[in-house]
Amino acid sequence: MSTYIDSWKNKKVFEKQLETNLNELNSYPQHWEYFVSFMSKINVQHLLDIGCGCGTYYELCRKHFPDVKYVGVDYANEAVELAKKHWNYSGFYVKNYKELTKEYIKHFDILHACSLHNVLPNGDEALQFFIDLQPRYMILGKLLTTKGASTYKVYKAYNEIETYLYYHNIDNVKKLFKQGNYEVFCNPSQLPTEYLLVRK
């Protein structure tokens, strides 16, 4: 199991991610459109991007929300070094999401996590962890759900690495939000979850 978790510590996969993202900057994919729309609806000054990968959300913030202070963290040094070099920005740090604390989160208005909880074998645990941090807002991307028990499958990302694709039990997601005193503020995808802005 740990082999797949560590598979993202791979320079080549983040180079492919960056190449894909740079092409997408000419015509935004839907989840980027959602991100820009969500951020336009709220007043925030400090954003923490968990699982930042090659760091393209920094560029989205710079272009659309230049007053927002962006910080990106990723457990993969390969991702962080690439992001720092390409975007010429020092606000990327090597950090596992499990190292985050409530005290650290107090410095941010909003937590952004896209393609993190869904590439873990324990996505429910990760979602619970984010909620327990109690940020004021959270943007949760690619929050895939199922009516059955939470589960995952294995797939190949960027034709490079084997990784997980996690599906959360929808009732458990709703329960976790309720227990954490969060409400779904925006869900433009019109799905039970998928891409959400939640707030306290």
Predicted regions and their residues:
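Conserved SAM-binding loop
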Residues: A83
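Conserved class I S-adenosyl-L-methionine
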Residues: M1-M39
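Conserved beta-strand signature within the Rossmann-like core of class I S-adenosyl-L-methionine
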Residues: P135-T146
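Conserved SAM/SAH-binding beta-strand->alpha-helix loop
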Residues: A76
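Acceptor-substrate binding/catalytic loop of class I
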Residues: Y155-D171
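A short SAM/SAH-binding and catalytic strip from SAM-dependent methyltransferases
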Residues: I110-N122
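Conserved SAM-binding strand-loop segment of SAM-dependent methyltransferases
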Residues: N88-E99
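Conserved SAM-binding loop of SAM-dependent methyltransferases across substrates and taxa
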Residues: C54-F65
